[in-house]
Amino acid sequence: MGKIRKNDTVVVLSGDDKGKQGAVLELIPAKKAAIVKGVNIKTKHRKPSNKNTSGEIITFEAPILLSKLALVAKKATKDKPAIPTRVGFKIENKKKIRIAKKTGKAI
């Protein structure tokens, strides 16, 4: 059971996209990375080929390391920024559940 899962809302802690938040689209455990919607946008230039007669510029979300991400305890509003939190685990009724360390509530 991972601390960050698909469809979780996360915030970026460091780098060019610091402070941005988005939903996790995909996890890549081998690289310890995740693809987050709207974060770490890269552009790729494709050369013209037989299939594609004109070249094109493609934008896509590149993977970002999990160490640069934190789960969002409370979503951002106009007045307050998002509150990042660490994740802990607790066993209730013989089930392991994730707990937000800042709020103490189940995720």
From Swiss-Prot:
Gene: rplX
Name this protein carries in UniProt: Large ribosomal subunit protein uL24
One Pfam entry name: ribosomal_L24
Phylogenetic classification of the source organism: Bacteria, Bacillati, Mycoplasmatota, Mycoplasmoidales, Metamycoplasmataceae
Subunit (UniProt): Part of the 50S ribosomal subunit.
Source domain of life: Bacteria
Keyword terms, alphabetized: Ribonucleoprotein, Ribosomal protein, RNA-binding, rRNA-binding
InterPro entries: KOW, Rib_uL2_dom2, Ribosomal_uL24, Ribosomal_uL24_CS, Ribosomal_uL24_KOW, Translation_prot_SH3-like_sf
Function: One of two assembly initiator proteins, it binds directly to the 5'-end of the 23S rRNA, where it nucleates assembly of the 50S subunit. One of the proteins that surrounds the polypeptide exit tunnel on the outside of the subunit.
Similarity remark: Belongs to the universal ribosomal protein uL24 family.
PROSITE patterns tied to this protein: RIBOSOMAL_L24 (PS01108)
Cellular component GO terms, alphabetical: ribonucleoprotein complex; ribosome
Keyword Cytoplasm set for record: no
Organism: Mesomycoplasma hyopneumoniae (strain J / ATCC 25934 / NCTC 10110) (Mycoplasma hyopneumoniae)
